[in-house]
């Protein structure tokens, strides 16, 4: 492991994603947290929003007062990073974005699945972060786009079947994803609160879920994709129903997944 230490800023540090980033970075031997930003909690301690990080000697600062660091991690809502990307690069050589702003390859995809893109010139330089499958592309990347949660669980579930030629891409694929309430974020609203979700199973975006775009881009196939909000807090569990054109044994499946992930 490298002994070099990198300075980092977490933009949007009060949300669930920002809090997890801060926790991971605080415990990482190669990172030093230089700054965490929050417009609503500026000057308050990180522990004010994340009690598990009370021992972290750090206060939130305004995102308008960015410091120069090695890496900026952006844990902001969709649309923020694409608007601020030039500013980010004025303060860091590497940007890791956890929103959907740089996951897709073309402006046309953003027109179809989102509301367009204000910085399409950055899309081709972005590397989709799925370390199990794109690890070799990540070192040295200037712009890293963290994959969507539901797309990640689906891609990891299906990719070994294509690599082992169990699937060719012509088959029907049905994906049913169960997700916890944290997926909606700290400001997810009533639909993500425990009283509203407890004991229920509810489909979310049953038609044209945006994570379908990432799955189709990465695997090159279309899937029938439905996400269900269920009574749990964390996690994304994808059940992928596939229909191979030839018999497949349990041993074939073990070999495919072990070959990909061991």
Residue spans for each PLM region:
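N-terminal Rossmann-like NAD(P) cofactor-binding subdomain of oxidoreductases
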Residues: 1-204
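Charged docking surfaces used in two-component/phosphorelay signaling
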Residues: 168, 183-262
């Amino acid at each position: 492991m490298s002994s070099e230490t990198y300075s980092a800023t977490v933009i949007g540090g009060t949300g669930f994603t920002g809090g997890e980033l801060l926790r991971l970075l605080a415990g990482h031997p190669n990172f030093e947290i230089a700054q965490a930003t929050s417009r609503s909690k500026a000057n308050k301690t990180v522990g004010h929003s994340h009690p598990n990080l009370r021992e972290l000697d750090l206060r939130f600062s305004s995102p308008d007062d960015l410091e120069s660091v090695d890496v900026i991690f952006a844990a902001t809502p969709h649309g923020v990073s694409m608007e601020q990307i030039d500013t980010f690069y004025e303060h860091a050589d590497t940007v890791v974005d956890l929103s959907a702003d740089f996951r897709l390859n073309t402006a046309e995809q953003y027109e179809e699945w989102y509301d367009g893109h204000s910085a399409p010139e950055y899309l081709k330089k972005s590397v989709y972060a799925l370390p199990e499958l794109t690890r070799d592309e990540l070192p040295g990347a200037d712009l890293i786009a963290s994959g969507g949660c539901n797309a990640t669980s689906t891609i990891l579930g299906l990719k070994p079947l294509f690599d082992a030629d169990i699937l060719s891409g012509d088959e029907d694929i049905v994906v049913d994803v169960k997700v916890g309430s944290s997926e909606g974020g700290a400001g997810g609203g009533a639909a993500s609160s425990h009283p509203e979700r407890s004991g229920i199973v509810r489909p979310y975006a049953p038609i044209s879920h945006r994570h379908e775009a990432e799955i189709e881009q990465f695997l090159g196939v279309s899937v029938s994709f439905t996400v269900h909000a269920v009574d749990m807090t964390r996690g994304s569990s994808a059940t992928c129903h596939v229909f191979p054109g030839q018999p497949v044994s349990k041993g074939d499946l073990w070999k495919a997944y072990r070959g990909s992930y061991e």
